[in-house]
Amino acid sequence: MPHKITVEVEGELTDDSWVVDFGALKEIARSICQELHHKFLLQRDSKVLQMDEGMSNWKVRFLERGWVFPKSEVLPLPIDNTTAERLAEYIGGRIGDALKDCGATNVSAITVGVEEMPGQTGWWRSR
């Protein structure tokens, strides 16, 4: 994923006087981004694409056009569009889940920005 992401967390300070350990947060974010990197991000919840998952490939159709992608190069995501905003929402949700799994129950908000190019960033904030 060649996009730049920004992650902000808010919450109560721990006994160590931080909201989260930045090292752990960076590792979580990097791991998620690595999963997305060099993959065709398929918007599984699209209202305009028709998709068929085969044994070795994905067939995607839009109106009269169609494409076939090897499964090894596709990452199906539970989003309706691969906009920066939806990718930020997906990444933010994954970060939130991972932080909870690490015991960071003090986090009250997560904000994620996905920058497609300088000055063009889509934002998502947890509620």
Could you say what each language-model-derived stretch is?
Residues 1-127:
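Charge-rich, low-complexity N-terminal segments
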